[in-house]
């Protein structure tokens, strides 16, 4: 079964959104991982509803599927990367992040997206882990209530350096929340290479029941740097075999190339990344 491949708009920030979408469709991508940010779809825009409506029509015309990502660096605070997070010591800061995530869930529902991606945030200085986990579960419970009502999976990403950094941390969160159906996983293949004890392919297989979104790129062990394919250490043929099994077993979402620091070469990397992944697929089927 052919993988449904996408490219992240956080790697195409020098392009207008329509230009990025037409590029991906022309190249042959199946979808887009759309990061809500000021240069593409600003979730704080006063005319957000009109923008979402226009975007929905464009996606239908181009036959592109979509997943919504919420990892914009400065969308809520121009001075703090990814701040305020769900772990902010200030309750108003946490509430601002919750409001943004709830808006993302509504946008995703309006666009017919597969899932909404999110993450925990970095443990702030002076905050003990127990308090941080309580804040995380309390705030995500609010978002999950909205997501459940709209039938939209909330796909939490284990992120190196964050409170929720590993697959084990994801399962800890599931336990704390009572294993809600709406809570899923964003599985980043590079992060598996960076942090997990198991191989990336084994991570795909072990996490399969909870995967709602997949990000893919190359990476080196112990170094959190998203790299173009071939520039890191990942053995990709077994990973694609595992992803093919995931898709065959009913995963409906996208597998999205994630190169957020390469927008300067975004169009060429979108082309070469698709060529690389489709080439591996063809080799596996030969």
Model-flagged regions — what are they?
Residues 2-3, 11, 37-38, 87, ...:
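Generic signal for short, ordered secondary-structure residues
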Residues 1-109, 209, 271-286:
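N-terminal pre-domain/capping segments
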Residues 43-54, 85-99, 127-138, 161-165, ...:
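Alpha-helix N-cap and loop-to-helix initiation/capping positions
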Residues 1-6, 13-30, 60, 106, ...:
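Histidine-acidic metal/acid-base catalytic patches
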Residues 34, 67-70, 113-120, 154-157, ...:
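Short beta-strand segments at enzyme active-site cores
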Residues 8-12, 37-39, 71-73, 121-123, ...:
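Active-site beta-loop-alpha junctions enriched in small/polar residues
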Residues 18-19, 61, 75-184:
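Active-site acidic/histidine proton-transfer and metal-coordination neighborhood
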């Amino acid at each position: 079964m052919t993988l449904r491949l996408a490219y992240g708009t956080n790697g195409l920030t020098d392009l207008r959104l329509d230009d990025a979408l037409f590029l991906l469709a022309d190249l042959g991508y199946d979808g887009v991982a759309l990061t809500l940010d000021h240069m593409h779809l600003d979730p704080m825009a006063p005319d957000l509803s009109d923008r979402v409506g226009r975007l929905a029509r464009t996606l239908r015309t181009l036959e592109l599927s979509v997943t919504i990502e919420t990892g914009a660096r400065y969308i809520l605070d121009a001075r703090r990367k990814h701040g305020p997070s769900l772990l902010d010591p200030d309750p108003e800061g946490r509430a601002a992040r919750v409001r943004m995530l709830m808006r993302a869930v509504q946008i995703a529902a309006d666009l017919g997206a597969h899932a909404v991606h999110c993450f925990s945030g970095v443990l702030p200085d002076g905050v003990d882990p127990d308090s941080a986990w309580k804040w995380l579960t309390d705030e995500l419970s609010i978002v999950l209530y909205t997501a459940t009502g709209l039938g939209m999976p909330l796909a939490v990403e284990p992120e190196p350096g964050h409170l929720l950094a590993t697959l084990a941390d994801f399962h800890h969160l599931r336990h704390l929340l009572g294993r809600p159906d709406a809570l899923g996983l964003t599985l980043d293949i590079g992060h598996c290479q960076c942090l997990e004890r198991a191989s990336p392919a084994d991570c795909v297989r072990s996490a399969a029941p909870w995967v709602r979104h997949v990000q893919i790129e190359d990476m080196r062990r112990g170094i959190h740097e998203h790299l173009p394919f071939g520039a890191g250490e990942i053995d990709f043929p077994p990973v694609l075999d595992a992803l093919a099994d995931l898709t065959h077993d009913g995963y409906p979402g996208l597998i999205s190339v994630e190169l957020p620091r390469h927008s300067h070469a975004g169009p060429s990397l979108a082309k070469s990344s698709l060529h690389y992944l489709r080439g591996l697929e063809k080799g596996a089927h030969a």
